[in-house]
Amino acid sequence: MNYIKPLFNKNNIKIYFKIHANRLNFDVKNISTSFLHDVKNCHQKFGICGNCKYKIAQDYKNMFDQVIYIGDGLTDRCVADLADVLYVKSESNLEQYCRENNIKYTSFASFLDLYKMFEEEKRNALSWG
């Protein structure tokens, strides 16, 4: 189960993009995690994270003009300086890392904040059209 989609659904936010995340597997007695994008020999200095976000972001950089990244944790550090636009959860490990390394980002407190920011960007883009 992708645990991000229910968060968006709870806030009535439609998803128009692919989500790359680990999966939570539930059975009667246990919860386990499936790592779908694990890279054993990751070249980043942060160690194995189970979901090589750097590789995914690099793949997108090769396909598109701009990479927009949303993160909050330690495993998001490797993408922080690769993303063209970076949204960082306020008071998170990633925000601390970005401050310490002078990486430009936009802070958000909740997914609802992001939704409002994206809606504003969409309105601005349409007004130029």
Question: Language-model features: where?
Answer:
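C-terminal cap/substrate-recognition subdomain and adjoining C-terminal extension
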Residues: 1-129
